[in-house]
Amino acid sequence: AVNDLEKTESYFLDKLGFSVRFRVDGWSFLSLGSFHVMLGYCPDELPARDTHEHSYFAYVNCEGIDEIYRDYQQSGAEIFQTIADKPWGLREFGVATPEGHRIMFGQDRPLGG
């Protein structure tokens, strides 16, 4: 649910590299490779940023995470968690949308020890 469909869609397209699959009244269907997102216009819903820890929207498993991270830095995407190797076997970072939805991107890496 997003309060401003046009602004949110533009962010996904311009900052995160998604493309439009199709649009229907109040909905925008976007893709990034094989990852798909449906944005629904809900003007009266509480913005994601106001839900605090419940604002996580998606986790994207991907390849080439360092390149994706650099691309997002260069595009001006809002990065709320910098890229890092995590003890649970992933290299990951997080971005936030203008309304505060948080999306994590992660790539598998070998576990040490």
Give the predicted meaning of each segment:
Residues 2-5:
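Conserved beta-strand-loop-alpha-helix junction that forms the acyl-donor binding cleft
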Residues 10, 19-63, 67-96, 107-113:
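Vicinal oxygen chelate
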Residues 99:
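Conserved ATPase active-site switch/coordination loops adjacent to the nucleotide-binding site
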